[in-house]
Amino acid sequence: LDQVIEYIKDLHFDENDLAYLKSLNIFDDDFLEYLANFHFSGDIYAIPEGTVIFPREPIIKVVAPIMEAQLVETAILNILNHQCLIATKSARVCYAAKGDGVMEFGLRRAQGPDAGTYGARAAVIGGCTGTSNVLAGQLFDVPVKGTHAHSWIMSFPDEYTAFKKYAELYPSACILLVDTYDTLKSGMPNAIRVFKEMREAGIPLTFYGIRMDSGDLAYLSKKVRKMLDEAGFPDAVISASNDLDEYLIESCLLYTSPSPRDVEES
């Protein structure tokens, strides 16, 4: 909604705009003069951002002379349709996560920089706890968070060295990406080794854990949880990424939830 209001308040036609429109030879001089002096005089009614809405309910109402309303119609629909879509999907995903934090990492797959930036804002409105989009964080004052990439791991001679260096740089927010080579045979043993070294060195393990970005996340998360618990790190965070939607998240949580027998034996 903020973007809609900013657009309408700033809408005007400068000399370059008017010269281009005139060159098309499809508008008469009276219309071009009208555009030169254009100022939106209508009223806009809208529900507050973040309000739950249902299909076929009006989100925004524009009351204005028909010429003014038609000039702003396409832009309003373009802004609202995309961001409502992102906010709605984010809300569904966050609801499926049942209170676990959901991060927005969508910039690289967005339809252009503006879509990625405003999509990040919409995702936070929908319930996401933060974004990897630093520009969105600066513009909209939303939390900026993230981990390291596979390229970080591959830039070092081996996985352990990459993990150790990252832990030195970010000891209070140490989330290690364990699936670059082999999650269970390489990534997890190396991550656990680094966590043990941090603990032995007296470094507080305030926020730490692993991230998985590939494979059968439901199956792997259960295996990973067991490895962390057996190594003495029951409070380590397990985070997942890569094409997660509400259905996959629900499946992962269902698969990894302890059964009554698990609870009895634990």
Residue spans of the language-model regions?
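Intrinsically disordered, low-complexity, positively charged segments
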Residues: 1-22
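Buried, small/hydrophobic-residue-enriched core segments of structured protein domains
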Residues: 26, 32-41, 49-54, 59-234, ...
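Conserved small/polar residues in nucleotide/adenosyl-binding loops
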Residues: 255-260
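Structured beta-strand/loop patches that form or line metal/cofactor-binding pockets in enzymes
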Residues: 44
